[in-house]
Each structure stands twice: as C-alpha cells, then as structure tokens.
Amino acid sequence: MSLYSPPKVDVNVVPNPRIINIAGEARLPAIVGVGPTVRYVTDEAVQRGVTNIDTLSVFPASNVVITKVAKRSGLNYVSGSSSNDPDAFVGEFGSLYLPSGSVVNSQIIDGYISLGNGKISWGQDPISVSKGHVPSTGSVYYVSYRYDVTSEQFEPKVFSDKQSLINTYGEEGNTTGSLTTAASIVLENGSPAVIVCQVSGSLSNYSVSSYRDSIDKLRKKSAVEEVIAIFPSGSLPTSTFRDDVHSYLFQHVQLMNSVGRWRGMYYGVPSPKYNPNGFDLIGDATISNSYIGKATTYSDSDVILVAPSVVWRTNSKNERIELDGSYAACAVAGVHAAQTLRSTPITGFAVTGINIEEDKWDMFQMNTLGAGGVLVLQNVAGLITIRDAITTDSTSADTQEINVVSQRRLVQRTLSQKLFETYTNKGKTINPQTVRDVEATTRSILNSLRQSGEIFGYGTKDDPNTGETKITAIQDSNEPRRINVTCSVKFLYPMKFISVTVSTFV
C-alpha cells in the first residue's frame, strides 16, 4: 500500500559550502606576574560532625594553619592582643574555641587539634561541650586559617569577574595582590575576560626563570591577543631583571607568531615611586632608561609601550596604590580587547581604572614621545584618553597602527584556521578541482571578513601600481603536497589626518 500525501510544496535550503563562518574565540589580554603562595580564609562555616573529625573545604591541602575558631563570624581575636572583642574568651558565655592543651583558669582544656591538612580533631568529652570548650554535635562554628597554594595556582586561568580574581590572588595591592589589580584594570576597561598566569615563587624569592616558565605556559593558549608582564612594587626586581623578562617575552611573541598563534606584547616601565630603578624620562634612543630608549629596544609592529610610568589607583578601602607603566598597559589592552571589531581604532578612547597626572606633558613633549614609538595616555580635565594608538614601529601605517596590525593578525589567523579545518587532514587529494575549491574558499573567507567590517576588501585583479593581486591557487611543482595561494587585502586605516587648503578671494 502506497503512502498518501496531500498536495504540497517541499522546500529544502541547501547550505552553501562556500559561506565561511569567521566567528572565533575572543582574543584576550594575558598577564604574568608574582602572586600569593599562601591563601587566607576568614570565618569558614563548619558544622560539627558526629565523629571527632571535621573537614574544612580546602582539604586536602598543605601546611594548613588555623588562626581562629569561634562560635560566631566576625569575632575579633588575636592571641595576646588587648583589642579583642569582649566575648573573645573560652567558656559557656564566650565565643572563642582554643586548641587542646590550652590553659584556661589554670586548667588544661580540651579543644581542637589541627591535623595540618584541612581536618580538625575535637575532643568528645561531654563535660568539655557543656563548658563551651568544644562545639556540640550539629552546631556551626567558624574557622579562619591559611594554607599553601597548590601547583594549580601557577597555571594559566581565565577570569571574567573580580570576585574570582580576589578568591584566587587576594585583595588588590601592588605586591601580593598585584595580579588582582592588573587583571581588574583589564576587565574595568571592557575586556570580556582576562588570562592570568602566576609566576612561581614568593615576593622575596622569584626569578627570571620563573617568569620564563609562566610565559612558556601561554604557548598552550590560542586565545591570547597580547601578553603583559607585571612586577611587584619594591626594591626588586632590578632593571636587568625586567629587561631579561621583557626580552624573553618579545622572543615568545616572535616564536608564537612564527607558528600561527599570533599575538603582541604590551609593556610599561617602572616609576621612581614604584621601584628604586624606575624613571620618568622622555629621553631618546641613546638613553636606555627612558621611554624612547625602551621603545627603540623593541621596535616592532607587535609591541606597544605605554606611558607614563607614574600611575596610581584607589582601592576599595579608598587607599592610594602606587602602580607603574605596566598597569597603564593593562588598561590599554582592556580597551583594545573590548572592541567587537579588530579593525576599530582606539585613538581617543577613554581609559579607566587608573590615574595619571593631569596635563603631565605639553603638546611638543607628547609629539616627541609619539615620534619615538610611545603610546601616550593623557589626562585632560580628569578624563584619561589614548592620545594615539600606535606600536613601537613607525615604519609605515601598516606597522604603526594598532588596528591595522590587529587586522593583519585576524587575516592570518582566519585564513590559517579555516583552510586547515576545511581541507587539511580530511582525506582529500590534490586534483584540479581541489585547487579550484581552495581558491574559492579563500575568496569566501576574505569576503566574509570584508562583509563583517574587519577589512576594507580583497584583491580581484592584478594592479602593479597599487600592489593589488587577485586570488590564485596552484599546486606546487616542487612540493606536490602543497597548494600555493596568493591574494591581497586592503586594510581599514584610522582617519588621523585631514588636510584643508583655503584660498582667498576678493
């Protein structure tokens, strides 16, 4: 028996295989720097169990040191201090618990024993419970403690909110909390997220090699748009230390660009208020400890040096935190990452989260800095803006403009990824049709970038006067496993100059 179907019209839309989705993962700033090696927890709520062992949320951990156990949260207690709360004592009417073996009223009491790994042992004596020395079964008490971070602390992590930063790297500061400060500045300037990698070692014991190790870990991350190294405030590091780290970071950028994981390097210099070796000098190419001297050292289209070095910020307690040029670089990186289109120029855009001196330089000084390859932040009437979004390479518009360099990376990344996803390792062989398909796919990719506003256009003809070349694909005669594609693109350049000629008449 045949199936009955009433009169109808069937319509099926067949996807066009040559329409390429160019949407990719967000491009994020990445920060490397020193952070806490010990974490602190205040007033974690714990419910007394039926056995003599209770477990903290951090278990299993190393070197857990309990600093306070209380019946209520917020109890102010420091052993031997006269500024304790009135109920900071042990007993039925007190709010404090003490370790077993403590002496209260000339008697040794039962209490808690920290096992050092996140577990707490309590005495089971009912008399101790009735006296308030031990919490009763089912009751809630509050524990403050510190513990050593694990190796996971030193792996790259992605953050999109400030509280997660605080939970991982502590409250803002310019020493232990410097990663929280730097990453918060990136987020406050609009970046959807930020990648952070803590350098191994404490504030008093970190090295160039530990910075190198953290930078190397970013090799695994494909979403990095630029990398920034920050350093804690204080007598360390030395100028040589910073130079060694920046040199290695520059090598990292060059290496990753050579293997198809394109990214850039943002950096700043220390101020005299942040580091004894800091400086705030315009200088020239011959003076190494000057803005222009540092920009000359890394004159490259993938490098951005941000000035000034004297930067500060107010934390949640309304305290001034002295920062340096690295944090200014974080602010600019956040503005850059906030743009939906890589082609968007950020010259004139506002920067938030940091403070700089108002009217620090006059027009001529800022022009000198710009000519030397320095991106200058200016504060006019309290509004901090990017005076000119440039790299350290002033060779041409293609190398100097940040948005043009970003377009270049986008074209490289998109062509590489989409052609690889479509053709490589797909069991395809090279024949005349394959060559034509690769050419057509290249055209579709570039057209998608043009339609989305990421580039001005792509070449459709050969014009030796402009350098335009049409898209062509051909099998390599020397390496028959390769298809060679040639094409050209025209970038979207920022409008920076307008020339007006005025004539007079009578």
Where do the language-model regions lie?
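C-terminal edge-of-domain segments
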Residues: 472-506
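Short, ordered beta-strand-loop transition motifs
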Residues: 45, 104, 108-123, 270, ...
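Long, charged, glycine-rich C-terminal linkers/tails
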Residues: 453-481
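C-terminal hydrophobic structural anchor segments
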Residues: 432-462
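Short alpha-helical segments and helix-capping/turn motifs at coil-helix boundaries
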Residues: 128, 208-215, 469-472, 485
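A glycine- and small-residue-enriched flexible loop/hinge signal that marks low-structured segments
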Residues: 1-45, 54-63, 67-69, 81-86, ...
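Surface-exposed interaction regions enriched in Ser/Thr/Asp/Glu
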Residues: 91-156
